[in-house]
Regions:
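Helix-to-loop junction immediately C-terminal to a conserved catalytic motif
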Residues: 56
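Catalytic Walker B motif of ABC-type/P-loop ATPase nucleotide-binding domains
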Residues: 167-171
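Conserved ABC ATPase signature
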Residues: 116-117, 142-146, 150
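Conserved structural motif at the start of ABC-family nucleotide-binding domains
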Residues: 10-12, 25-27
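ABC ATPase nucleotide-binding domains
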Residues: 238-264
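The feature captures the beta-strand-to-loop junction immediately N-terminal to the Walker
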Residues: 41-43
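Conserved ABC transporter NBD signature motif
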Residues: 64-72, 81
């Protein structure tokens, strides 16, 4: 896939889906442009995870059209899609006792035949990503013994060795302390590929992501440049909270403080 800001990774038109008798997404129309870091935000139940599950083929029965690299998403095989798109889910069981190296190497599977062995090129790619994610010293450790932050980096590393054009992540900072949240966000946005990350934290969204998509009750409330969207009116309308927003000269980003409506 050509990675330029002038082309769309995803072209979404009139996307809707009903699950368990409830309409979750309602008429989503949106282009996700290559070369940008997008953050998908919205309250619980607004449809964030559902939208990501559609973009990653985990949900296939939907209305409307989704084009990926100009081709109907439904026409991709799982393997073909995984050769250019990687997904970091909200929950990863990690129940098998792989070493970190073995676990990350699983990300090379979309580029192999069923019985192909790991190649020198596979080893080079995995070793490079282990270095990049600060996991090289842990490559012989069991994945089951890692801390939350280490395991999240391993999950990201497994996605990165796919060498994707597009990386999709569902709340990757959940259960991480502040230090590991910042490290992980820096890793995500430094990849120089298209990323779409669902988050709850608007401060992280404003600090790391240039593009914002806001969902409210299954519809797009706003999308565009993050700095143009995050404001007290949006926060009050979408989250039912009052807020104060200040520009932080040290970070070059805004800081958001929240207040309950009834407390003001």
């Amino acid at each position: 896939m050509k990675d330029t800001a002038e082309t769309a990774a995803f072209e979404i038109k009139d996307l809707e889906i009903t699950l368990g008798g409830k309409r979750i997404l309602k008429g989503i129309t949106l282009d996700i442009l290559n070369g940008n870091n997008y953050c998908l935000v919205g309250p619980n139940g607004s449809g964030k995870s559902t939208m990501l599950n559609i973009l990653t083929q985990h949900l296939a029965k939907y209305g409307g059209t989704v084009l990926y690299a100009g081709k109907d998403l439904k026409k991709y095989s799982k393997k073909e899609l995984a050769q250019t798109l990687a997904y970091v889910p909200q929950f990863d069981a990690g129940a098998f006792d792989f070493t970190v190296y073995e676990y990350v190497m699983l990300g090379r599977n979309p580029h192999k035949g069923l019985f192909d062995k790991d190649t020198e090129e596979d080893d080079r790619i995995v070793s490079h990503i282990l270095q990049k994610t600060n996991l090289a010293d842990l490559e012989n450790r069991s994945i089951l013994t890692l801390s939350g932050g280490e395991k999240q980096r391993a999950i990201l590393a497994r996605a990165l060795v796919q060498e994707p054009d597009v990386l999709i992540l569902d709340e990757p900072s959940n259960h991480l302390d502040i230090t590991n949240q910042i490290k992980l966000m820096n890793l995500i946005v430094s990849q120089q590929i298209t990323t779409v990350t669902a988050l709850h934290d608007l401060n992280l969204a404003s600090q790391f992501f240039g593009k914002l998509i806001v969902l409210k009750e299954g519809r797009i409330y706003a999308h565009g440049n993050t700095a143009d969207i995050i404001n007290p009116h949006m926060i009050r309308d979408v989250y039912h909270l009052n807020s104060e927003i200040e520009f932080n000269r040290k970070t070059g980003h805004i800081d958001i403080s929240f207040y309950n409506q009834e407390d003001i």
